């Protein structure tokens, strides 16, 4: 099974500081981590890979320093990682983000795409469903467990 997991590198919420004037996150000097829901998605993909075989490819859109998250995912056991990076993507909203990621996914072979529920730095929970919309494929949100039985996925919400 060819599994793609979309991940986002986010500020470590234990280190977050806010600009008192703009009420926006101050990201300078704040360590980044793999978004926790996305990390759970990596772990789910790796369990499926272990059970039925296949590959796990990590895809992320972000600045060049997001390669740290990709290297961590590779160390966890992912087979490949792709970083989509360009200054033009800075400040992209969820629709632009999902459109860009979907365009990259169209160039890959996949049987399953896993995205985290939401990113802790935005909490919109929109990118995963929007990727599915751009690709014209079905999606199931808020999945707690995935089982593979032959060509069928059984999911628990």
Where are these regions (language model features)?
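N-terminal glycine-rich FAD/FM-binding segment characteristic of electron-transfer flavoproteins
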Residues: 1-157
């Amino acid at each position: 099974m060819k599994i793609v997991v979309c991940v986002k590198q986010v500020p470590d919420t234990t280190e977050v500081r806010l600009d008192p004037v703009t009420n926006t996150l101050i990201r300078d000097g704040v360590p980044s981590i793999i978004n926790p829901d996305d990390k759970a998605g990596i772990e789910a993909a790796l369990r499926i890979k272990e059970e039925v075989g296949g590959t796990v490819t990590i895809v992320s859109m972000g600045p060049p320093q997001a390669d740290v998250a990709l290297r961590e995912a590779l160390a966890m056991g992912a087979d490949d990682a792709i970083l989509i990076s360009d200054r033009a993507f800075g400040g992209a909203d969820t629709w632009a983000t999902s459109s860009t990621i979907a365009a990259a996914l169209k160039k890959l072979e996949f049987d399953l795409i896993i995205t985290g529920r939401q990113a802790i730095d935005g909490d919109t929970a929109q990118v995963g469903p929007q990727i599915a919309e751009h690709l014209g494929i079905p999606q199931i949100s808020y999945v707690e467990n995935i089982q593979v039985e032959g060509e069928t996925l059984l999911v628990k919400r």
